[in-house]
Amino acid sequence: MAITAALVKELRDKTGAGMMDAKKALTETDGDMEAAVDWLRTKGLAKAAKKSGRTAAEGLVGVAVADGAAVAVEVNSETDFVAKNAEFQAMVASFAEAALSASDLDALKGTEVGGKTVETILTDKIATIGENMTLRRMEKLSGETVVSYVHNAAADGMGKIGVLVALTGADNGIGKQIAMHIAAANPASLSEADLDPAVVEKERQVQIDIARESGKPEQVIEKMIVGRMKKFLSEVTLLGQAFVVNPDLTVGDAAKEAGVEITGFVRMEVGEGIEKVEEDFAAEVAKTMNG
C-alpha cells in the first residue's frame, strides 16, 4: 500500500509522533492506521506524544560559540529535576552545537546528530525520561567578536539565562561584563533606534496622561514628558542603561572607554512568556486517577 502524505498526517495528528516516525510506522504495518498506532506505542513514541499536552516551562538555555558566530537554544522540561539530569544536559549541549550550522529552528529539528535527527532525539528522550520536553527556540548572533555568558549555570555552557554579545574592537574583558549586565538588567533593545515604535508611543501616551493629571501648564507638561521619556529610554535600552559594574557610566560610555562597539546581543531566559499551569495536589491525583 502506498504511504501518502495524508496518511502520515493523520497518524501524526492521532499520536503526535514525528514525521519520520509516523512514516516508518505506516511502512512497517503496510498502511494499517490502527496497527501503526500500536507500533508507535510499542516503541514508546505514542507514549511520548501523550505527554505533549503537559506544560514544559522549566529546562535550560544552551549556548555555543565558534568562528565569530554564536547561538542560544532553549530546551524545556516540565520540572527542574529533569533539567539537572545529565542525559538532558548532554542533549541540550548537542542541540546547541548543532544549531551553529542550522539556519533556523525548523532546520535544527531536521539536523542529524549521531545518526538521528534532533526531533527524533527529543522524542526518544521524552519516552525514556517520562516528561514532556520541547525545543522551543534558537537565536543566532554573529560579529567580529562574540562573547557568551550563562547565568545560574547548571553545567558548562548552559543555565537559566543565556546571553550573547557581538562586539567590534579588541575585547579586553569588557564583553563578559556587558553580557553579565544584560543578564541582570534585561534591556529591551540595543538602542532607541531598535525599539518598537509602538512601545515608545504607548509609553509616551501614558506619560502624557499622567502629566496632565497634575493640572500644570502645558509648557511644564511638555518638559515633564521629555524628562520622563528620556528616563524610560535609558532604562530599557542597553546603551542607555547605567552599567552594573560602574553605575556612573552608561553601558554605551563604558564600551566606548574600552575601545569597543556593541553591535548586537541576545538574551534568552528559560520559560519567559510561558504560562505555567499550577495544580494543587488533590487536583493532580484526581487527574491521574481519571486517566
Swiss-Prot record:
GO terms for cellular component: cytoplasm. InterPro entries: EF-Ts_dimer_sf (IPR036402), Transl_elong_EFTs/EF1B (IPR001816), Transl_elong_EFTs/EF1B_dimer (IPR014039), Transl_elong_Ts_CS (IPR018101), UBA-like_sf (IPR009060). It comes from Dinoroseobacter shibae (strain DSM 16493 / NCIMB 14021 / DFL 12). Residues 79-82 are annotated as: Involved in Mg(2+) ion dislocation from EF-Tu. Keywords: Cytoplasm, Elongation factor, Protein biosynthesis. The keyword NAD does not apply. Gene3D superfamilies: 1.10.286.20, DNA helicase RuvA subunit, C-terminal domain (1.10.8.10), Elongation factor Ts, dimerisation domain (3.30.479.20). The gene is tsf. This is Elongation factor Ts. Associates with the EF-Tu.GDP complex and induces the exchange of GDP to GTP. It remains bound to the aminoacyl-tRNA.EF-Tu.GTP complex up to the GTP hydrolysis stage on the ribosome.
